[in-house]
Amino acid sequence: MGQDSKTLIVIEPGVYIIIAAMLLLVPISWVLSWFSAIVLHELFHCASLCLLGYRILEIKFRADGAKIISAPTAVLHGIVCTAAGPIGSLLVLLFSAMMPRLSVCVLIQSAFNLLPVYPLDGGRVLRGLLSYMKNEKAAETLIMLVEWFVITLLLFGAILASFWLKLGFTPVLIPVFLLLKTQRLKIPCKRTNHRVQ
């Protein structure tokens, strides 16, 4: 194989901090299941890209998720490859009796990833679908409204869970994290850099 066929896999330092924290707080069987779910999810993204004939340039694991950088994709192919991660991961649920921990991790990860908030997979699919709209301003406004609605709903749910179920402040961090991430990464519907998360 030539130099051109290699894919760079990068693991950023924040990932090691997350792993160390999880090993201190969670049984190792759950940690292994969680990271297996992440790897499976990314493998389904990679498999769909390869099946559609695209070259994967880099796979980057970060503390806030993983990112696959590929050669530029057509919009429809980008939608298919983005949706392949959560949909493929959900196929693992067919084996839930044999792998209950992995199935729980896959279900939680897929549900979270399908939220229509960019840069999650659901938000990427929504952006891809709305990129077909003629009016880019209307598409961007619709995306912003959907994201704010979902994050607001999550925030109210997290606050209720925190007080009613006495879960502490931790559930509120998820919508706050999403809110910060969407504000930092706002991009127009017109795609110039084709990436699949």
Regions found by a protein language model. Give the residues of each.
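Hydrophobic transmembrane alpha-helices and their immediate loop junctions
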Residues: M1-Q197
